[in-house]
From Swiss-Prot:
Pfam families in UniProt: Cut8
Organism: Neurospora crassa (strain ATCC 24698 / 74-OR23-1A / CBS 708.71 / DSM 1257 / FGSC 987)
A molecular function GO annotation: proteasome binding
Name recorded for this polypeptide: Tethering factor for nuclear proteasome sts1
Signal peptide residue numbers: none
One record GO biological process: protein transport
Sequence segments annotated as region (Disordered): 1-69
């Protein structure tokens, strides 16, 4: 029994006795420096390698996904209106617009009010296109007047109708500037000169009618221009000489315009009015000189 018992009685610390603390570890400066370097190396590795960062691991980078129209099936569809208009050329667009205006007169009126006025160059460009079509229809070689007329009848009437529509646009009171009106009439008269001449009288009525209309247009512009500054624009632009050449080329078919030039403009008809003669029977009168194309020609003085 004595053998089993401990020779020393067990020791129980007193409750008021302070517990023993473990002795403090004394770490060498070498150990602390090595651990500090290791911690710094770990931080550097984590900052260099994105996979080593716990923040990167917890947040996965998302790639931008393609925008897919969900629920919309791909199928054929008409072009939008702006794209459709881009495919139309000038003639097609003009035809579509004209059809819409004919179906809806209100839209046609709105277009006429909103569209800018045509310029002389714009009008002459359109007339030039009609003139090109007429020239292309003229047959080659010596053809009879009847055959030639029926070949060119449609483009000829189209050109004459276009002249009849454009000419009033450049006449007063629509056009207030006499120089603009005279410029248009000068080019329009040249177009009339180029209309085909036919041997038969029954085929020449288109050209004769065009001369008559253009002559009345000249007379109207001259009359209105004479009311402003005594026809200064006519004198400054030498329009009397231009008109005389046109009349001579037409074979005297611009007589109404020539009469307006003499009667309305004082400096043209001064010679005849001074002698109290209004008739054109005198071959030396201003009117006859304008008609004959001799107005402004040098006059011989003396016996030579």
């Amino acid at each position: 029994m004595n053998v089993l018992l401990s020779p020393q009685p067990p020791f129980f610390p007193h409750q008021h006795e302070p517990s023993r603390r473990s002795p403090p570890r004394i770490m060498s400066q070498h150990t602390m420096a090595s651990r500090k370097r290791k911690a710094d190396d770990d931080d550097n590795e984590m900052s260099i390698s994105p996979t080593g960062s716990p923040a990167i691991n917890s947040r996965q980078l998302s790639r931008p996904s393609k925008k897919v129209r969900a629920g919309i099936e791909l199928a054929g569809r008409p072009l939008p209106l702006p794209r459709l208009l881009e495919t139309l050329d000038k003639s097609q667009l003009r035809a579509v617009l004209q059809t819409i205006c004919e179906r809806h007169p209100g839209i046609g009126h709105e277009v006429m009010v909103s569209a800018p006025r045509p310029s002389v160059n714009g009008a002459l460009e359109v007339l030039g296109e009609y003139q090109d079509k007429l020239r292309a229809a003229i047959p080659f070689g010596n053809s009879s007047s009847e055959y030639t007329y029926f070949r060119v009848k449609q483009p000829l009437m189209a050109l004459v109708d276009a002249l009849g529509d454009f000419t009033p646009q450049f006449l007063p009171p629509v056009e207030q500037q006499a120089t603009v009106s005279l410029e248009y009439l000068n080019h329009a008269t040249k177009i009339v000169h180029d209309l085909p001449d036919f041997d038969s009288q029954q085929y020449r009525h288109h050209k004769d009618g065009a001369y008559d209309e253009i002559s009345r247009a000249w007379a109207l512009v001259i009359t209105e221009a004479a009311k402003r500054g005594g026809g200064f624009h006519l004198h400054n632009g030498k329009w009397d000489q231009v008109l005389a050449k046109h009349n001579q080329q037409s074979g005297g078919k611009l007589e109404q315009a020539m009469n307006a030039m003499v009667n309305e403009v004082g400096w043209v008809g001064a010679n005849s009015n001074a002698h109290g003669q209004g008739s054109s029977s005198d071959p030396n009168s201003i009117l006859n000189q304008l008609i004959n194309g001799t107005y402004g020609a040098p006059v011989q003085v003396g016996p030579f």
